A protein has these predicted regions:
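Catalytic cores and adjacent flexible loops of soluble metabolic enzymes
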Residues: 1-227
């Protein structure tokens, strides 16, 4: 059985601190992950003004806008991430949440793209990602069969390689909700590689997914669950 491609999802668990990000990258490398993944958003494009202006106390200020902006890295930080990943010899890539962020990631020579579960319903975004012609991991959390049909059709039409990632979008996911047999159903229905993006505590479900022949495994990482 071939080992799955291991993705350490850092997301925004760096808390806006490049030193924390580098520690997470090093830990992922030391633990045997093949790559680390970040999330990139253009805050003003992803959230509406009403949401951004709501009161929210955080280390970055008193509004949701302050918090969201405080958690975003920009080019200076991503340049450092790019260089550091080369230094420790690990791949990195990002899941963009809007087209501007997708274009931003073009600044770097990345092998992969990632469609977050929430973005699988955005037809325009899917088309733009598929046009990049980078191998793309497509998470299927919360999606219907029609959503997945549409995404697969777009990537095939653009001749862009992809794999689906079975995902249950609860945090943390209960073991009894894993529904791992979906992995086999996705393989059969779409004749493609299928991975697993896990949100559960522990490793038992992930190990079971590996036994079902997943080609990629994504797990969230942090230095401290209280951060």
């Amino acid at each position: 059985m071939k080992n799955p491609y291991l993705i350490a999802e850092i997301g925004i668990n760096h808390n806006g601190d490049i030193n924390v990000a580098k520690k997470l990258i090093k830990n992922a490398k030391d633990c045997g992950f093949n790559s680390v993944k970040f999330q990139k958003r253009t805050i003003e494009a992803v959230y509406d003004e009403k949401t951004l202006n709501t009161s929210r106390e955080s280390p970055w200020g008193k509004t949701t806008r302050d918090q969201k902006l405080g958690l975003e890295f920009e080019k200076l930080q991503y340049d450092e991430i790019d260089n550091y990943c080369k230094e420790v010899d690990i791949e990195w890539f990002g899941s963009a949440w809007d087209i501007k962020s997708l274009e931003f990631l073009d600044n770097y020579n990345l092998k992969f793209n990632k469609i977050a579960s929430a973005m699988i319903v955005d037809q325009e975004f899917l088309n733009e990602v598929a046009k990049k012609n980078r191998h793309t991991f497509i998470s299927t959390g919360m999606s219907t069969k029609e959503d997945i049909d549409n995404a697969v059709s777009i990537f095939k039409k653009n001749n862009c390689s992809f794999e689906l990632m079975h995902c249950v979008s609860t945090y943390p996911m209960k073991v009894e909700d894993a529904n791992l047999l979906t992995i086999n159903e996705l393989k059969k229905e779409y004749n493609c590689n299928v991975g697993y993006s896990g949100h559960e505590n522990g490793v038992v479900v992930s190990l079971a997914a590996i036994m079902l022949g997943i080609t990629s495994l994504e797990r969230h990482i942090t230095l401290d669950r209280t951060m």
